[in-house]
């Protein structure tokens, strides 16, 4: 536990604020999930891991968190626009299957990838198609407020009227309405809008449109922005604590969510807005047209021309956590290899720590070392409480590993520590690595079974000078990503760094 107050960077106010939940100890958090028309990629992983860390740390601080992360399975049109084809329906036509087959397949892919990345499931995972009545009711509320209009079966949000009534539109993203209007390109179908800045709440479905529902305005489907407003209101109330998502969603998606909630509920939806930054590939924005679009499955298997090897899910997770969530994260093979090495170092720290026992040796306690270890642990939590800065926490963990190594190599007896400091070191390291950062062991073999037996064979082969057998056992360990350590006090294994 930390004595530091949790501070978060609120995109809405552009500053760090002390986190004070509306109804402590309860916390409501809504995060925009994926549109499930293709395999998950690095961008999906970064957002999921970012808010998994937020979820984990809030729980560590004893908050009771209701975490809602949606699945968009209808209404998200190409180019995030109000015209064009539904992304899922388009994929379904290409593959000659039902849209919900596409939804089912890629939702399962997404869940499987997140399980591998050790991302905790949210408390609730609603789908847009499962909440059509709630969305229709919200459109009716916005129409009643005077901030929407219907035109030939479609309903649009009247951004100009909303802004003229002293409401803030563009506040989250820092955009000005006049610039939005002048900078919007003309699209087919925009003649049904009063202004190019207006956005769809409900769209009239063309006869060939697959996914459509009855509504007071005719057969149609909900606007992409409306889905999140309706679902967050249903499960978290009209105002909740945290709304999160990728920085690319800030405009128009999150900006429109705020406007919808203010129009329907007369209040802003979230107290704190958190946005994770983007991932670049060798300094370039990730995109299919650039040939640098990498799915998570390709990362796990190494099956992509840009990849020099496969990278494990924990390597991907650690790579993501090495940077603060608001920083741009640049992918490269070198960066992932370095992350893999660093992750193994953290796991070696865990293994060394688990092998230590508190000594009953009669030695003088080293007060300076006690103080130093306690300060390092405090620094770990200080990093987490400073806007979930995992980069600082990981750097502090490496400082703690250096201290653990001193005891593991028997350069000092654990008796130089107080029993309290020793136990604090063990429990804090385990809690931070496993529970807060969500890093877990990836060794496929059983350390208590096969590894122990092989180490006995290795020791015997060395004593009998059977060096071919020694080399064979070392080679097997290397294949498993492990290394054999010959030390003064005996033979042990570690993760290969």
Curated annotation (Swiss-Prot):
Enzyme class: ligase
Domain of life of the organism encoding this protein: Bacteria
Keywords: Aminoacyl-tRNA synthetase, ATP-binding, Cytoplasm, Ligase, Metal-binding, Nucleotide-binding, Protein biosynthesis, Zinc
Binding site for Zn(2+): 32, 228, 253, 257
Transmembrane segments: none
Keyword Oxidoreductase: no
Cofactor note text: Binds 1 zinc ion per subunit.
Gene3D superfamilies: Cysteine-tRNA ligase, C-terminal anti-codon recognition domain (1.20.120.1910), HUPs (3.40.50.620)
Family annotation (Pfam families): DALR_2 (PF09190), tRNA-synt_1e (PF01406)
Record motif 'KMSKS' region, residues: 285-289
The UniProt record lists the keyword Transferase: no
PANTHER family from the UniProt entry: CYSTEINE--TRNA LIGASE, CYTOPLASMIC, CYSTEINYL-TRNA SYNTHETASE
Stated family: Belongs to the class-I aminoacyl-tRNA synthetase family.
Protein name as it appears in the record: Cysteine--tRNA ligase
């Amino acid at each position: 536990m930390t004595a530091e107050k949790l501070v978060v960077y609120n995109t809405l106010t552009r500053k760090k604020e002390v986190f004070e939940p509306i109804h402590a100890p309860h916390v409501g958090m809504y995060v925009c999930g994926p549109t499930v028309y293709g395999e998950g990629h690095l961008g999906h992983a970064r957002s999921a891991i970012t808010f998994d860390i937020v979820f984990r740390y809030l729980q560590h601080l004893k908050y009771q968190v209701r975490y809602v992360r949606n699945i968009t399975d209808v209404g998200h049109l190409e180019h995030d626009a109000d015209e064009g084809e539904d992304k899922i329906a388009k994929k379904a036509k290409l593959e000659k299957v039902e849209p919900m087959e596409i939804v089912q397949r890629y939702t399962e892919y997404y869940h499987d990838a997140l399980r591998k990345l050790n991302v905790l499931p949210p408390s609730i995972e609603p789908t847009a198609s499962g909440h059509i009545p709630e969305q229709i009711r919200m459109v009716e509320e916005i129409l009643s407020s005077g901030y929407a209009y219907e035109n030939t079966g479609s309903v649009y949000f009247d951004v100009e009227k909303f802004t003229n009534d002293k409401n803030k539109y563009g506040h989250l993203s820092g955009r000005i309405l006049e610039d939005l209007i002048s900078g919007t390109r003309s699209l087919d179908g925009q003649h049904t809008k009063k202004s190019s800045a207006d956005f769809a709440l409900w769209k009239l479905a063309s006869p060939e449109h697959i996914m459509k529902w009855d509504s007071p305005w005719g057969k149609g489907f909900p606007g992409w922005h409306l889905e999140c407003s309706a679902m967050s209101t249903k499960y978290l109330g009209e105002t909740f604590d945290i709304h999160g998502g990728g920085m690319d969603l800030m405009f128009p998606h999150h900006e429109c969510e705020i406007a919808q909630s203010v129009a329907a509920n007369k209040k802003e939806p979230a107290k704190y807005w958190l946005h994770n930054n983007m991932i670049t590939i060798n300094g370039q924005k990730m995109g299919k047209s650039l040939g640098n679009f990498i799915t998570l499955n390709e990362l796990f298997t190494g099956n992509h021309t840009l990849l020099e090897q496969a990278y494990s899910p924990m390597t991907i997770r650690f790579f993501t956590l090495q940077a603060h969530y608001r920083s741009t994260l640049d992918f490269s093979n070198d960066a992932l290899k370095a992350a893999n090495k660093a992750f193994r170092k953290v796991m070696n720290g865990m293994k060394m720590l688990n092998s230590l026992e508190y000594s009953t040796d009669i030695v003088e306690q080293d007060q300076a070392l006690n103080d130093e270890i306690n300060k390092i642990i405090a620094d770990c939590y200080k990093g987490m409480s400073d806007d979930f800065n995992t980069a600082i926490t990981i750097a502090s963990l490496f400082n703690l590993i250096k201290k653990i190594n001193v005891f593991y190599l028997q350069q000092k007896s654990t008796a130089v520590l107080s029993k309290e400091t020793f136990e604090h070191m063990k429990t804090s390291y385990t809690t931070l690595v496993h529970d807060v950062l969500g890093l877990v062991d990836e060794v496929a073999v059983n350390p208590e079974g096969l590894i122990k037996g092989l180490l006995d064979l290795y020791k015997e082969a060395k004593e009998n000078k059977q060096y071919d057998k020694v080399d064979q056992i070392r080679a097997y360990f290397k294949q498993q990503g492990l290394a054999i350590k010959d030390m003064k006090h005996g033979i042990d294994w570690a993760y290969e760094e």
